[in-house]
């Protein structure tokens, strides 16, 4: 059966720590803490990357860009996202739209959402209207509510290319 669409789902979470920049959706946000990770720890772009790869049946971000590989230490997640996009296109798929939710007690995501949308749209060759970003707090509950980390959930619709 030749199904013309696939859905990919991605999730990522990183701890907030002192002494690192906070980068979400390729946007550096002024904040007291940043996300801990092997790369730049961009929780949103990691979830988008996982959703793309998963939807195309290509595994996940760890398979293609392992945190055990020093080549990816401090890597710009936009570079990783574009590389994943190339792999997805080579497999015969193209993203149609991206819907993301960022879970963060702080900082406020709203003032930065348009820049995040623009980055993702540019990296995936999409119209900005095909990328949606929502933000939720955890109402003070759990590790996210205690400001110990930030998480992101992403859904991507893929269509057969060409």
UniProtKB/Swiss-Prot annotation:
Keywords recorded for this protein, A-Z: Isoprene biosynthesis, Lyase, Metal-binding
GO-annotated biological processes: isopentenyl diphosphate biosynthetic process, methylerythritol 4-phosphate pathway; terpenoid biosynthetic process
Site (Transition state stabilizer): 38, 137
Cofactor annotation: a divalent metal cation
Domain of life: Bacteria
Originating species: Bordetella bronchiseptica (strain ATCC BAA-588 / NCTC 13252 / RB50)
Binding site for a divalent metal cation: 12, 14, 46
GO MF terms held by the record: 2-C-methyl-D-erythritol 2,4-cyclodiphosphate synthase activity; metal ion binding
Protein name in the entry: 2-C-methyl-D-erythritol 2,4-cyclodiphosphate synthase
Catalytic activity: 4-CDP-2-C-methyl-D-erythritol 2-phosphate = 2-C-methyl-D-erythritol 2,4-cyclic diphosphate + CMP
Annotated SUPFAM superfamilies: IpsF-like
Top class in the EC scheme: lyase
Quaternary context: Homotrimer.
EC numbers, comma separated: 4.6.1.12
Family stated for the protein in its record: Belongs to the IspF family.
Cofactor note: Binds 1 divalent metal cation per subunit.
Pathway: Isoprenoid biosynthesis; isopentenyl diphosphate biosynthesis via DXP pathway; isopentenyl diphosphate from 1-deoxy-D-xylulose 5-phosphate: step 4/6
Spans through the membrane: none
One Pfam family per UniProt: YgbB
InterPro entries with a match to the protein in the record: MECDP_synthase, MECDP_synthase_CS, MECDP_synthase_sf
Positions bound to 4-CDP-2-C-methyl-D-erythritol 2-phosphate: 12-14, 38-39, 60-62, 65-69, 146
Matches recorded under Gene3D superfamilies: 2-C-methyl-D-erythritol 2,4-cyclodiphosphate synthase
